[in-house]
Every structure is written in structure tokens, then in C-alpha cells.
A protein has these predicted regions:
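Secretory targeting and sorting signals
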Residues: 2-50
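Substrate-binding/charge-relay-adjacent region of secreted/lumenal peptidase catalytic domains
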Residues: 50-285, 289-311, 333-387, 393, ...
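Short acidic, Gly/Pro-enriched loop/turn segments at secondary-structure junctions
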Residues: 315-321
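Phosphate-binding P-loop/Walker A region and its immediate neighborhood
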Residues: 329
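An often Trp-containing, charged/polar helix-loop segment at the C-terminal end
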Residues: 397, 404-453
């Protein structure tokens, strides 16, 4: 029996956030297909462009039809991998989707070398400068503890020729949500199984931030794992404290790839204050369940002081489109995100509308991720492919830190002030597989369908250079 099936049974019984409200069952588990290639944008070689952070790129495999890694890259480039592979949610509450060996399978796709997009591919797609110089700190807030975090990050960065980033040099720092040492990892039982799953999310977050800003410092902050019906306010309170810890430690940007139910406790008072820090960019995933169909977006992407990051499908050939599962919606507890124009909030009856901006999130065009933490199954994932808006949020946080123009940042305000030339407008795609905009009076179609200008799936578009940041 596949030992991972026992772990996924936990997922199917837990409650997941769908459109900012809890739903049980498989609604949050996306049976989509995915895969990608490190060299997808520049050809069939593993990496063709110069490293964004300097160093030598290691090609994982020679170009040849018989090599399975090369074949994955070619299939992704052609968009045909969706015919034979699937994808599933990585963990409850998080917005990551891991590619599986085949449709209907829970077993993650394993590759002997990077098969998803790497830093150089994404830099080319977004028109980023060849070199990264910033040493600003990107804080990543995750649940649970990953004992292999540092070594897995080192392997990822070495594979793509990025500068080393470890605890000895001070480039990588690990803290718990109150600023102390991270707790010991769970060694057995359901806790170990959950931490094994969450480790994929953690690796994705750190790898994505590294890809966006290869020279930035990284601060990984762990919050206790909570997922019960009554633990929503406990969890959001812990995440809020973690943001304060990150800011106190000097973070320039903070990324959260988790979503919780919005309620009066976390949309006001101390929690709201903790996620409002002028001069610090705070990004959050909009989720992977399409248009939310309700009056509340998932916390914390619903907050005015947070940049809500949606998702696109990013093929090697042809324009990007809005990812079909990218979260979008309204938050009626607020009139607008900071700096959000009336033309945007009109889609939600002049309330906070999401998303603000977007980046690659489709697991079909997802990121190369390296993760070996397997305390429960004993079966490391190694190289795999992961998408979801958990990929786009830390990437955008990395761009904020890399650009360094943060003094006026509060929520997405500076993005809306930037010229249109700083973005690639995404004009195709819809996220109505779960709910349709037409079924909700007062909701405009732009919340569900990508088109010219702002839309719910992709916000004002995906980055074109660093000018907007």
C-alpha cells in the first residue's frame, strides 16, 4: 500500500477554506494536472539563461528524447503533461498544489533533477534584471517545522547556481512566531504526517522567494499547527504575531501562503494592526478555489494592508492566462485595499476586491521544488513540481524586497500607482469552475474572467520588470 495514502486521508477529513468560508470534503483538493520545466521559456535545456544571482548553472540532464526529466520539460512546454498527470492540495489551509504521478493519484511526481521552472526561467518571463544585488530580508511564515529546511534550500540554490544562503552566514534565520527558537519537529503520529506535508509548502515558499531575489536574506518563521473548527482565531492570532516578529527582525517583505476564515476577531483589533506596517510589504495567497462567491475573502488576503496575490498559467509559448483555480472575490468588511482605485472596488460594490497582482500559480506551469523531509512516510519527494497561489505570493514578496522601494508601501498602494508598462496585462482565462459571477447580484464579471485592465484572477497583471516594486 502507498504510505502516502494514509496521510492524504487526513486531508480529506479536515476542513479547508473555500472562498473565505469553510467547506468539507474535496472542494479544496484540486484534481488538476501539472508539470513544468526548468528551461521551458528558453528551450529544452535545463537552464539556458545566466543565473540571476551569479554563479554557474548546472544542467540536470542532456537534451534527449529518452531522458524522463527532459521529456517532462518538453511536455510542459507543449502543455501536454496535463493529459497524463494530476495535482492535489499539499496541506489543509495552505494554497500549494503538487503534481502527482498520474491523474487520480496522491503520489507526488518525483524527478531526478529540476523539471519545473527555475529562477532564470521566471526572470525571463517577468523581464527582470540579470543581476540581483539586494540583501533585504524576505520573511516566510509557515506552519509546523521542517528539519531538512536548510539542507533542502542549499540543494535548490546549488542546482540553479544561486549564492549560498545558510544559517552560518546569517543569510538564513529560523525563528518561531514569538521570536524564539523553532520547536522540535514531530517525530511520529498525525503531527509528523502533517509536518511532512507542510514541508512541501515551506520548501516552495523558500524556493520561490530565492528565485525572485537570489541575493536576499531569508527569515523562516514557524507557527504552531492548528486546524480545528475552534482554532481559527488561535491560528490567525499566531500568524499575526509572526508578522510582528518578522518586522521586528528587520524584514522588508513578509509572505503568507495560508488562508483562514475571515471574522470579526481577525479583521479588527490586534490582528488587523499586526498586519499593517508601513514600509513593509506583506503578501498573501488568494487561494486555489476560484471565485469565492461570497462576501468574504480568505484571511489575510482580504485585509486592506496586504497585497493579495492571484495566479496565472505561464506557458513557454503563447500569452499567460488567468489560472482557472486562482482565488478572487470581495471583502465587504472593508471599503478598499490601501490605494485601490474606485474603478477596481466597483467590481465588489466598492469594497475590497482581490486579487491585486499575480504571478505563475498553475501547477501545469509550476515551480521546481526540492524537499526531502519525510518523518512519517520515509519516502522523500526530492525534486518535484508545485504550483498554487502559494507559489505566487512568496515570489511577489521577493520582488518587493529585491526592488527595495518600500518606504511608501502600505498594502498594494504602490502597485496601483505604477504605470501600466510595469505589468503584463493578462487578458484571458476564467475561474468559474466552482462558482459563477452571474449567480451573485452586484458582482461584476471581471471578478471571474480575465480581461483588459484589472480582473479578479490576476489583479493588475503580472510583473514586467521591477518598476512597480
Amino acid at each position: 500500500m502507498d504510505r502516502r495514502r494514509g496521510r492524504t486521508a487526513l486531508r480529506r477529513g479536515v476542513r479547508a477554506v473555500v472562498g473565505g468560508r469553510r467547506a468539507t470534503g474535496g472542494a479544496a483538493v484540486l484534481l488538476v494536472v501539472s508539470a513544468l520545466l526548468t528551461g521551458a521559456l528558453s528551450g529544452t535545456q535545463a537552464v539556458a539563461a545566466a543565473p540571476a544571482g551569479g554563479g554557474t548553472v548546472r544542467t540536470a540532464a542532456a537534451d534527449g528524447g529518452g531522458d524522463p526529466v527532459v521529456r517532462l520539460r518538453q511536455e510542459v512546454r507543449a502543455g501536454s503533461l496535463l493529459d497524463t498527470h494530476g495535482a492535489r492540495a499539499v496541506c489543509p489551509r495552505c494554497a500549494a498544489q503538487i503534481v502527482t504521478e498520474k491523474k487520480g493519484s496522491d503520489t507526488p511526481l518525483h524527478a531526478s533533477a529540476p523539471a519545473g521552472y527555475g529562477p532564470q526561467d521566471l526572470a525571463k518571463a517577468y523581464g527582470l534584471p540579470a543581476k540581483s544585488k539586494s540583501t533585504a530580508t524576505v520573511a516566510i511564515i509557515d506552519a509546523g517545522v521542517d528539519a531538512n529546511l536548510a539542507s533542502d534550500l542549499a540543494a535548490y540554490r546549488a542546482a540553479f547556481g544561486l549564492p549560498a544562503c545558510d544559517t552560518a552566514s546569517g543569510c538564513l534565520t529560523l525563528k518561531n512566531y514569538t521570536g524564539g527558537k523553532q520547536p522540535a519537529p514531530q517525530k511520529s503520529g498525525p503531527g509528523a504526517a502533517l509536518e511532512e506535508d507542510v514541508a512541501v509548502e515551506t520548501s516552495l515558499d523558500l524556493d520561490a522567494a530565492s528565485a525572485a531575489c537570489p541575493t536576499c536574506h531569508l527569515l523562516e518563521i514557524s507557527v504552531p499547527w492548528q486546524d480545528g473548527e475552534d482554532d481559527n482565531d488561535v491560528s490567525t492570532g499566531d500568524f499575526a504575531k509572526a508578522v510582528d516578529t518578522a518586522v521586528a527582525a528587520g524584514a522588508s517583505a513578509v509572505s503568507i501562503s495560508y488562508g483562514y476564515t475571515a471574522d470579526v476577531t481577525n479583521t479588527s483589533g490586534a490582528s488587523l494592526k499586526s498586519l499593517r506596517h508601513k514600509g513593509v510589504a506583506i503578501t498573501a495567497s488568494t487561494g486555489d478555489s476560484g471565485f469565492n462567491g461570497g462576501i468574504h475573502q480568505a484571511w489575510p488576503s482580504n485585509l486592506p494592508s496586504v497585497t493579495a496575490v492571484g495566479g496565472v498559467t505561464l506557458p513557454a509559448d503563447g500569452p499567460a492566462t488567468g489560472w482557472w483555480a486562482a482565488g478572487s472575490g470581495c471583502e465587504t468588511d472593508f471599503t478598499a485595499a490601501t490605494g485601490q482605485p474606485a474603478a477596481v472596488t466597483a467590481a465588489c460594490g466598492h469594497h475590497r476586491a482581490a486579487a491585486d497582482v499575480s504571478a505563475d500559480a498553475d501547477p501545469a506551469t509550476g515551480l521546481a521544488v526540492y524537499d526531502t523531509y519525510a518523518p512519517s512516510s520515509g519516502e522523500p519527494v526530492d525534486w518535484t513540481i508545485v504550483g498554487g497561489t502559494s507559489a505566487s505570493a512568496p515570489y511577489i514578496a521577493g520582488l518587493y524586497a529585491r526592488a527595495g522601494h518600500l518606504s511608501a508601501v502600505q498594502g498594494p498602494n504602490t502597485l496601483y500607482q505604477a504605470p501600466a508598462s510595469d505589468f503584463t496585462d493578462v487578458t484571458g482565462g476564467t475561474n468559474e469552475d466552482y462558482r459563477q459571477c452571474a449567480d451573485y447580484p452586484g458582482i461584476r464579471a471581471s471578478l471571474c474572467t480575465a480581461g483588459p485592465g484589472w480582473d479578479g484572477l490576476t489583479g493588475i497583471g503580472m510583473p514586467h520588470g521591477l518598476g512597480a516594486f
